[in-house]
Curated annotation (Swiss-Prot):
The gene is ADF2. It is found in: Cytoplasm, Cytoskeleton. InterPro entries: ADF-H, ADF-H/Gelsolin-like_dom_sf, ADF/Cofilin. GO terms for molecular function: actin binding. This is Actin-depolymerizing factor 2. SUPFAM superfamilies: Actin depolymerizing proteins. Residues 5-137 form the ADF-H domain. SMART domains: ADF (SM00102). Signal peptide: none annotated. GO terms for cellular component: actin cytoskeleton; cytoplasm; cytosol; nucleus.
Amino acid sequence: MANAASGMAVHDDCKLKFMELKAKRTFRTIVYKIEDKQVIVEKLGEPEQSYDDFAASLPADDCRYCIYDFDFVTAENCQKSKIFFIAWSPDTAKVRDKMIYASSKDRFKRELDGIQVELQATDPTEMGLDVFKSRTN
């Protein structure tokens, strides 16, 4: 199904991998990219993948959509997790790509039922672990 604003389709695998992450916690991260006018799964991060490895894997000059299953401990010492959606749009990305990702984001997010927190990041500091922790309340 294409988005009228951007003409983007969403590959079925995008939703299937997200549901798998949500239900079975098979992955820690999912990185999506737009290719040939559709959103596709670019790579999956194993449950053991560290946050630093995930952040380092994002391209420095290209946009991506990401899902990150963030584990944390509450003030009451309870283990919890929240599913973050990250719109990665680095300052060095091409303007046209930033526009395509921005115009397709809401439509794509609607396909992924269960996102709990959304972040917009243009550089790694905007999606640091401290930012994740501050958004878990």
